[in-house]
């Protein structure tokens, strides 16, 4: 199970939101590349980038920052989400050195877009399912759909989606613990490996996820916990490596 540090980008800065609310953000720094270096130096094997402005705008806004991080760490797998709603955007990011693009809103509104992109960019497509009480939210989490997250995961089972990033919105940025049960349900809904996100606070959450990782959980994204020091990614990754051996 991979421990994946998150770098959320808003107005060019590295921030963290609470429950996805843009007006409830904490700015951690003005140099996202420096934060990326900090996590790389601690042994991160992948980075999770989110263009928060892009998620609301429906197109990349912090793309230059994403490109700068990708160029600074050419050997490091990077995944990007937020505002990815066209083949052109996906192609742009992949050419810039990003390894995986996360399709969120468009996956809910036009599932066939995911099917097509998996054919066009095989091995590079991740679906982001952000759920509130089990139902998928879209447009920077501003809207909640009537689509169940597990149903959508099952829909993509044979499309060639690389992974699913599953976020429990109610827990995101709240430091209240990860929703293990919902994450396992998501993993069981399809054969696609699931990356857990939202609420990861400390080693208790990592242990809880590692215990059920065999259900199909391939990673855990952590943001506020590593910025505020309640979780050490070196310790967390070392634990996951030992448990998986």
From Swiss-Prot:
Keyword Cytoplasm: yes
Major location category of this protein: cytoplasm
A Gene Ontology term for the protein's cellular component: cytoplasm
Organism this protein belongs to: Teredinibacter turnerae (strain ATCC 39867 / T7901)
Reaction(s) the record says it catalyses: 1-(5-phospho-beta-D-ribosyl)-5-[(5-phospho-beta-D-ribosylamino)methylideneamino]imidazole-4-carboxamide = 5-[(5-phospho-1-deoxy-D-ribulos-1-ylimino)methylamino]-1-(5-phospho-beta-D-ribosyl)imidazole-4-carboxamide
Pfam families cross-referenced by the UniProt entry: His_biosynth
Keywords linked to the UniProt accession: Amino-acid biosynthesis, Cytoplasm, Histidine biosynthesis, Isomerase
Pathway: Amino-acid biosynthesis; L-histidine biosynthesis; L-histidine from 5-phospho-alpha-D-ribose 1-diphosphate: step 4/9
Active site: 8, 130
EC number(s) recorded for this UniProt protein: 5.3.1.16
Domain of life: Bacteria
One BP annotation, GO: L-tryptophan biosynthetic process
Protein encoded by which gene: hisA
Location in the cell: Cytoplasm
CDD domains for this protein: HisA
Gene Ontology molecular function: any one: 1-(5-phosphoribosyl)-5-[(5-phosphoribosylamino)methylideneamino]imidazole-4-carboxamide isomerase activity
Transmembrane segments: none
Family of the protein in this entry: Belongs to the HisA/HisF family.
Top enzyme class: isomerase
Protein name: 1-(5-phosphoribosyl)-5-[(5-phosphoribosylamino)methylideneamino] imidazole-4-carboxamide isomerase
